[in-house]
From Swiss-Prot:
Protein name: ATP synthase subunit beta
Keywords noted in UniProt: ATP synthesis, ATP-binding, Cell inner membrane, Cell membrane, CF(1), Hydrogen ion transport, Ion transport, Membrane, Nucleotide-binding, Translocase, Transport
Function field: Produces ATP from ADP in the presence of a proton gradient across the membrane. The catalytic sites are hosted primarily by the beta subunits.
The species this protein was found in: Helicobacter pylori (strain P12)
Keyword Secreted appears in the UniProt entry: no
Gene responsible for this protein: atpD
SMART domains (UniProt xref): AAA
Residues noted as binding ATP in the record, renumbered to the chain: G155, G156, A157, G158, V159, G160, K161, T162
Catalytic reaction list: ATP + H2O + 4 H(+)(in) = ADP + phosphate + 5 H(+)(out)
């Protein structure tokens, strides 16, 4: 047996124990097994997770372990799992070990990076807070993203999480000339498939790299896929000096797969059965998502909240890292207002006059006050009707309804379905429009003119056309 070869001594589901004669692979080192199942040649990658004493290691499999038997030969790589990086990854789909899985020509990478890397040091990190303009009115105005910040995207099924993700990818590609990386962490294969074809249809595929570790895969693949995607994003930030968007769907599944791995490795669980190292593992991933003096990684993370319990250890460990939250609300979607972002529930750390400027802060808080007042008046309106309100309250209700309509916006990636051309609205135009509504400049314009348009100029044109027709 060669020095770097070992043999399998035990297989427990996705956990494999391997014994080496003279060599001891390091923690996180990759091991390769080539074997045959029913006449089909297969290869499997393992990652060393624990040393068991002697020259024995416990490793986590990155794919199904069916067909493995004791005494099979295992080869140590002498290095970690490495994945392709660079512009050649754009428009392709990868699995956790960096193999292309889109049935196209296999990628022969010219450059690979290990998936476990150090977070940027204090000296490398950028301390200035800069707003990241998305071109989506409701986000830029009420819950702005910061460059290199982390955003939580909360929402149930079918309220438009994927459409917002695609629109952000589109706007980053076309307005900021940047790239995006999408990591599908433990979600449905069907959703990954849909996303790929929707992106192809929406024309954004050539600006994004997709990494999938789906629900049906072992916990090792579901956990490490987040690092695979992040490594690709880090290359664009560190080597190309770009501002990259990183999407993780779903960050809860990262914690969940970590819990499964922890139990399989024999660690004693902590609260609610999660791994004792939950906070540390979450920090290891989140700390790598940062702004440096070269570029930035801004991440949007979909967060599944089990049983709607925000105190569950997994979502609670995510909250500590988030700079902004974008909450999608089914009631808003039912009104036909898309994007269905809740203007009162969504938050942002940078929504303060020091960070975004006095004018933006004033307009944003003014809008929130009007919407909150409208929400408070809903019960009275339901019982007594609009006529019983004071003149001032009637004005508030009128403006609030216009604001609600004006927070809707046609998306580029939804053009195929809606038939109305997408709009990118600059922050300047957004502030001008909403500031004008608050000042009462547009009180004479009917509320339907505010629905599904971009800037306030379009509202005026739409109102003019409505009047003429």
């Amino acid at each position: 047996m060669k020095a770097m070869e070992g043999k399998i001594i035990q297989v427990l589901g996705p956990v494999v124990d391997v014994e080496f004669e003279s060599y001891l692979p390091a923690i996180f080192e990759a091991l390769d097994i080539n074997f045959e199942v029913n006449g089909v040649q297969k290869s499997l990658v393992l990652e060393v997770a624990a040393h068991l004493g002697g020259n024995r290691v416990r490793a986590i499999a990155m794919d199904m372990t069916e067909g493995l038997v004791r005494n099979q030969v295992v080869k140590a790589r002498g290095k970690m799992i490495e994945v392709p990086v660079g512009e050649e990854v754009l428009g392709r789909i990868f699995n956790v070990v960096g193999e292309s899985i889109d049935n196209l020509e296999p990628l022969k990478p010219s450059l690979t990076w290990p998936i476990h890397r150090k977070a940027p040091s204090f000296e490398q990190q950028s301390t200035k807070t800069e707003m990241f303009e998305t071109g989506i009115k409701v986000i830029d105005l009420l819950a702005p993203y910061s460059k290199g910040g982390k955003v939580g995207l909360f929402g149930g099924a079918g309220v438009g999480k994927t459409v917002i993700i695609m629109e952000l990818i589109h706007n980053v590609a076309y307005k900021h000339n940047g790239y995006s990386v999408f990591a599908g962490v433990g979600e449905r294969t069907r959703e990954g498939n849909d996303l790929y074809f929707e992106m192809k249809e929406g024309g954004v595929l050539d600006k994004v790299a997709l990494c999938y570790g789906q629900m049906n895969e072992p916990p090792g693949a579901r956990n490490r896929i987040a690092f695979t995607g992040l490594t690709m994003a880090e290359y664009f930030r560190d080597e190309k000096g770009l501002d990259v968007l990183m999407f993780i769907d779903n960050i809860f599944r990262y914690a969940q797969s970590g819990a499964e791995m922890s139990a399989l490795l024999g660690r004693i669980p902590s609260a609610v059965g999660y791994q004792p190292t939950l906070a540390g593992e979450m920090g290891k991933l989140q700390e790598r998502i940062a702004s440096t003096k070269n570029g930035s990684i801004t991440s949007v993370q979909a967060v599944y909240v089990p049983a709607d319990d925000l105190t569950d250890p997994a979502p609670a460990s995510v909250f500590a890292h988030l700079d902004a939250t974008t909450v999608l609300n089914r009631k808003i979607a039912e009104k036909g207002i898309y994007p269905a972002v809740d203007p009162l529930d969504s938050t942002s750390r940078i929504l303060s006059p020091q960070m975004i400027g006095e004018k933006h802060y004033e307009v944003a808080t003014g809008i929130q006050q009007v919407l909150q007042k409208y929400k408070d008046l809903q019960d009275i309106i339901a019982i007594l009707g609009l006529d019983e309100l004071s003149e001032e309250d009637k004005k508030t209700v009128e403006r609030a309804r216009k604001i609600e309509k004006f927070l809707s916006q046609p998306f580029f990636v939804a053009e195929v379905f809606t038939g109305s051309p997408g709009k990118y609205v600059t922050l300047q135009e957004t502030l001008e429009g909403f500031g004008g509504i608050l000042e009462g400049k547009y009180d004479h314009i009917p509320e339907n003119a505010f629905y599904m348009v971009g800037s306030i100029q379009e509202v005026l044109e739409k109102a003019k056309n409505m009047k003429n027709s």
